Amino acid sequence: MQSRKGSLSIESENMFPIIKKWLYSDHDIFIRELVSNGCDAITKLKKLDIMGEYTLPDDYKPSIQVVVDTEGKSLSFTDTGLGMTEDEVDEYINQVAFSGATDFLEKYKDKANEEQIIGHFGLGFYSAFMVADRVTIDTLSWKEGATPVRWESEGGINFEMSEGDKKEIGTTITLYLSEDSLEFANEYRVREVLTKYCSFMPVEIFLSKEGAEQEYETIDKEELREDDVVVENIVEEAKTEERENENGEKEVVEVSPRKEKVKINKRPVSISTTTPLWMKHPNDCTDDEYKEFYRSVFNDYKEPLFWIHLNMDYPFNLKGILYFPKVNTEYDNLEGVIKLYNNQVFIADISRKLFQSS
């Protein structure tokens, strides 16, 4: 493909009401939007596999990798989704506010479950320019014979598009942060935002820091997985002690058996729990699971008084868990909080005051 430059086409009728309502209301929302885009891309690729239009490799692992580069003042998001062709970048990126998710649903509305497609407005990607002076996209489509594409824009107005060098199907979006947004070049700040918005997304999300020292862990050899990177094999010889038996005679007794262990590169831990408790049937949940979920979500280490598991399909689809906390004294805060998720993506904390009539 030939390298070319251009200006973005903005469908303002769709775009600007959305900007006024929410795009700039929360400075950290761009992370939620970019991760949601990656999740959508993975969901679409899986659906193409289900419909027989694509065959996923046997070792396919749906995931989103977020990498913080503190020295480079950048933040990248890499998904293993369906990627984009040059024409699709033109359609979904260069024409702002034309939603790829909406178009995908329209094409496959009779075959795909639209509830699992997160994007609706096509603006998620452009939230990146809330914090970045320059943004690049490196993408390779799932389509046979597709050419990798590299897209770059400064300020979200003009762009340059050329042939890329991405080898694996999927998309990497890299944000080169502006000076007033360098807080997002901090691993702990990004982890905080990912935990806030993406703890229950249906795809595993991994966070790492560019240039970080490799960490290791030691496990029993029988726990070794195919994807583990073995650094060292360790043998712990059996331990024995000399003890006196019931006859008063001394004998050597094995107190710890011989163990074979391996030192491996530390396994990454996903930030997201892909199947949150509210998605399960109430009959499949234990009291301990309900209590632990309450503690982790609401940061309240007192046990709830009781709870109601909501699982409605009519007149609308609603799943959730309504907890009633214990109130020990008259000084305890009685104001409730509802945590609202749409397709497992955190939307907002809703105070009880919002439901009170004026």
Please provide the spans of the model-predicted regions.
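GHKL (Bergerat-fold) ATPase N-terminal catalytic module, capturing the glycine-rich phosphate-binding loop
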Residues: 1-179, 183-184, 192, 199, ...
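GHKL/Bergerat-fold ATPase module in large chromosome/replication-associated machines
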Residues: 117, 135-158, 178-182, 188-358
